[in-house]
From Swiss-Prot:
Its main location: cytoplasm. ATP binds at G119, S120, N121, G122, K123, T124, T125. The gene is murD. It comes from Bacillus cereus (strain Q1). This is UDP-N-acetylmuramoylalanine--D-glutamate ligase. InterPro entries: Mur-like_cat_sf, Mur_ligase_C, Mur_ligase_C_dom_sf, Mur_ligase_cen, MurD. Cell wall formation. Catalyzes the addition of glutamate to the nucleotide precursor UDP-N-acetylmuramoyl-L-alanine (UMA). Its EC number is 6.3.2.9. Keywords: ATP-binding, Cell cycle, Cell division, Cell shape, Cell wall biogenesis/degradation, Cytoplasm, Ligase, Nucleotide-binding, Peptidoglycan synthesis.
Length: 450
């Protein structure tokens, strides 16, 4: 860990606990800061807050009183999920108090360079692929962020010869000041998180913060097939490395002659790749680009692609019951992810979908319903998904209250040779704490059918 003195004896407010807030508060105390921790949940229900209080921190729970800002606060470290419209953040901004997220702290203390990966979809798969390729290539990667360990915990122990690979959301990237990844990858952009950002434009600008501090000594890995991403890459001063699944890229990554190429050199045959889904070729090209920029050999990349079958909750094969194959795609928290999941199958499919209502309709899914024989909806968005299914002309449409019920109904509507797919097209927070919990409950419900 770098020797950092900028936080010593400073009053720093950590807003929102959870895993990242807990880690940030613990680190800041270690760095000599006077840490004030604030969380909306009452202290009696807040185990993490009680632990921080036991460590000697000033803990205020049960709301976000504006009076906290009267304590000569020099920095606010906020949980990524707390919107900037929260009154305490509005007031902090008016007082010109810097507001950052935990990944910013991680960067400031890390001896190791960062690889940052963002996009509307494919972040987790690309991050895991990158990690595995760097590991196979003996580049000493450590994984952090939305998957793996909280970034500032990883960064404390990361050495100069290691690489911190981190998946970054728009929420995290809104709170960066100095964060400068050696390699920044921007995979794709489409309309999402409008309840948080307001517009697609603001959402895209938040993600473009990944380029904010890059220089000509850094690299920006860009999806050449996404016009929005290409436009936002103008914010990068780094060396741009493009990837495309639709056209040849001489100075980047592409597919030609049924093989993946990087800067004109064949890296791997498409036939050697075991990860299913056409959409995953984009993720592979991005990860391959990062790996090649960091000096990983073609042999190491090929070895990973011959064994990497995917990540949990992302088109995860669960089991086969009476010749019906069950897939868990709980990580599909938006329409684009579900579109890609549906495109991965040619068999008749029974779709389970629904979740948190973020204000969007689901008509964009209609062209992808061509192999969907039945849909079972649940959660807040069930009525909207029913409307889309009716417009698509589906014969079998059913709504239920719980995911357990949805699994039973989906099986009842299936026949020999069908795929039964959980791909919600929505966030999970209306009924579940996380998409992981939703996926685990789906898997448990499937096994109850046996």
């Amino acid at each position: 860990m770098k020797t950092v003195t900028e936080f010593q004896n400073k009053n720093i407010l950590v807003l929102g606990i959870a895993k990242s807030g807990y880690a940030a508060a613990t680190l800041l105390q270690k760095l000599g800061a006077n840490v004030i921790v604030n969380d909306g949940k009452p202290l009696a229900e807040n185990v993490l807050a009680a632990e921080l209080q036991a460590k000697g921190m000033d803990v205020v729970c049960g709301g976000h009183p504006l009076e906290l800002l009267e304590r000569n606060i020099s920095l606010v470290v906020k949980n990524p999920g707390i919107p900037y419209s929260n009154p305490i953040l509005v007031a902090a901004k008016e007082k010109q108090i810097p507001i950052v997220t935990e990944v910013e702290l991680a960067y400031r203390i890390s001896e190791a360079p960062f690889v940052g990966i963002t996009g509307s979809n494919g972040k987790t798969t690309t991050t895991m692929l990158t990690f595995e390729m760097l590991k196979e290539g003996q580049k000493h990667p450590v994984i952090a962020g939305n998957i793996g360990t909280v970034a500032c915990e990883v960064a404390q122990d990361a050495k100069e010869n290691e690489v911190v690979v981190t998946e970054l959301s728009s929420f995290q990237l809104m709170g960066v000041e100095l964060f400068q990844p050696k390699i920044a990858a921007f995979l794709n952009l489409f309309e999402a998180h409008l309840d948080y950002h307001g517009t697609k434009k603001e959402y895209g600008l938040a993600k473009a913060n990944i380029f904010k501090n890059q220089t000509e000594n850094d690299y920006s890995v860009i999806n050449a097939d996404d016009a929005d991403v290409m436009a936002l890459s103008a914010y990068s001063k780094g060396q741009k490395v493009l990837f495309s699944t639709t056209k040849e890229i001489e100075d980047g990554a592409c597919i030609k002659d049924n093989a993946l190429y990087f800067k004109g050199e064949k890296v791997v045959e498409v036939g050697d790749i075991v990860l299913p889904g056409q959409h995953n070729l984009e993720n592979i090209l991005a990860a391959m680009s990062i790996a090649k920029l960091l000096g990983v050999s073609n042999e190491a990349i090929t070895a990973v692609l011959k064994r990497f079958t995917g990540v949990k909750h992302r088109l995860e094969y669960v089991t086969t019951i009476n010749n019906r194959k069950f897939y868990n795609d709980s990580k599909a928290t938006n329409m684009l992810a579900t579109e890609k999941a549906l495109s991965a199958f040619t068999q008749p499919t029974v779709l389970l979908a629904g979740g948190l209502d973020r204000g969007n309709e689901f008509d964009d899914l209609i062209p992808y319903f061509k192999n969907v024989k039945a849909i079972v909806t649940f959660g807040q968005t069930a009525p909207k998904l029913v409307r889309a299914a009716e417009k698509a002309g589906l014969d079998t449409i059913e709504s239920v209250d719980t995911l357990d019920e949805a699994v039973v109904k989906a099986y009842a509507h299936s026949t020999d040779g069908d795929v039964i797919l959980l791909s919600p097209a929505c966030a999970s927070w209306d009924q579940f704490k996380t998409f992981e919990e939703r996926g685990d409950i789906f898997i448990q419900a499937v096994h109850k059918l046996i």
